[in-house]
Amino acid sequence: GQTEACGQVFHWSEGDTFVLPAGGEAIHSSDTHAGLYWVHDAPLLRYLGVSTVKPVFEPCFYSHQDARAQLDAIASNPRGANANRVSVLLGNNAFPQTRTVTHTLWAMLGILPAGQVQRPHRHQSIALDFAVACQPGCYTMIGTELDENGMIRNGHREDWAAGAAFVTPPGYWHSHHNESGADAYVLPIQDAGLHTYLRTLDIAFSNRGRADLSHTP
């Protein structure tokens, strides 16, 4: 497919990501049936009672093929064996401090290898998680408390489905599980750009074997 916006034309295929600034029109077209997962700032603007004045960044395109190549390289590196997450962070040169795709939104492409668990973590940004590819047996546990082993107590289970999205609420612990026989890929999009700017992200990770917390600086 392709998108015409801001005087540019973007040619895209399955898994590609692009961001467009406010204002102007975007015309999307495709020779075959296509679905776009669209996340935008309208709820925030509506809550504040404001409208956009000017664009604050240029359009940016992220190739899924390039991101997957980088992700595979990271996943095969032994240094990542003990990492809480294995992912490629999508960035924009306009936002070097927040390391986000827009001034408000953060995105990354992550892999959850077959048979692995991404241990509980939490943050004050809300996460809109898009399941890029997965098999039955992939799910997320969500809850407010940890047990003595640092896992979620009495959590809610949200099963993944390829092409579907789920929400992890702000401040809730969540862990990702892959009990299938195939690697899974997920694209979380968060309002972490806004929280990073306000210094309110407050991300924390559970420690293995105990319920106290490890905070990032």
Where on the chain are the PLM-derived regions?
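Active-site proximal loops enriched in glycine and acidic residues that flank catalytic Cys/His/Asp
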Residues: 124, 132, 142-144, 169-172, ...
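Extended hydrophobic-aromatic, low-complexity segments
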Residues: 121, 138-141, 150-151, 176, ...
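A short glycine-rich, His/Asp/Glu-containing loop-to-beta-strand
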Residues: 82-127
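Double-stranded beta-helix
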Residues: 31-80, 177-217
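A short beta-strand-loop-beta hairpin characteristic of the jelly-roll/cupin
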Residues: 1-14, 131-162
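Short amphipathic alpha-helical linker/capping segments at the junctions of internal repeats
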Residues: 15-18, 145-150, 155-157, 165, ...
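Conserved hydrophobic/aromatic positions in well-ordered beta-strands
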Residues: 37, 108-110, 129, 187
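Conserved metal-binding segment of the jelly-roll/cupin
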Residues: 11-32, 39-42, 158-180, 186-191
